C-alpha cells in the first residue's frame, strides 16, 4: 500500500504516527494492498480556502476527504473496500493541525490524538462512510473508535 504524506502546515507533526494509523485503518478495512492514499497537512488559511472552494463552508475545518477513483471503491459502508487486485487511487485526506489542536483542547486529549482520530475519520470518508444522518453517524463513529482503539493497542505493546 502506498501512502504519501506531506506536511505543509508549519506545525511539527509525528508524520510516522499519522502514516501508521492510516495504514492500520486501511488494513483493518480490508483495502487492497495496491491502493494509494495521499495525506496532506495544511495551515489554517489554506484549509479555510479548501473548505470554501470544495464544501462551501466558511472558515477552516479539521479534515477534508477527496475520493479520487470512486469507481474502484466498489463497496458500501461495511463491505470490503477496494478488494480487487488492480491499483486503486483512494484519494486525498487533508488535515489541519491547528484546528485539530483547538478541538483537542476542548475534548481534553492531545493534539496528536486528535490528528490520529481525524486521519481515521478521513479514511472512512474515502471508503464511503458518512455522518449526515444519526444512524450513519453512530455507525461511522463506532467504527472510528474501534479502529483507533485497535491501533493504540498495537502501539502500547
Curated annotation (Swiss-Prot):
Entry-linked InterPro entries: MetalPrtase_cat_dom_sf_prd, YbeY, YbeY_CS
Origin superkingdom: Bacteria
MF (Gene Ontology): metalloendopeptidase activity; RNA endonuclease activity; zinc ion binding
Pfam family, one: YbeY
An example Gene Ontology CC term for this record: cytoplasm
Keyword Transport applies: no
Cofactor section: Zn(2+)
Cofactor: binding details: Binds 1 zinc ion.
Gene Ontology biological process terms, A to Z: rRNA processing
Secreted found in the keyword field: no
EC number(s) reported in the record: 3.1.-.-
Family: Belongs to the endoribonuclease YbeY family.
Record HAMAP family: Endoribonucl_YbeY
Protein name: Endoribonuclease YbeY
Source species of the chain: Salinispora arenicola (strain CNS-205)
Species classification: Bacteria, Bacillati, Actinomycetota, Actinomycetes, Micromonosporales
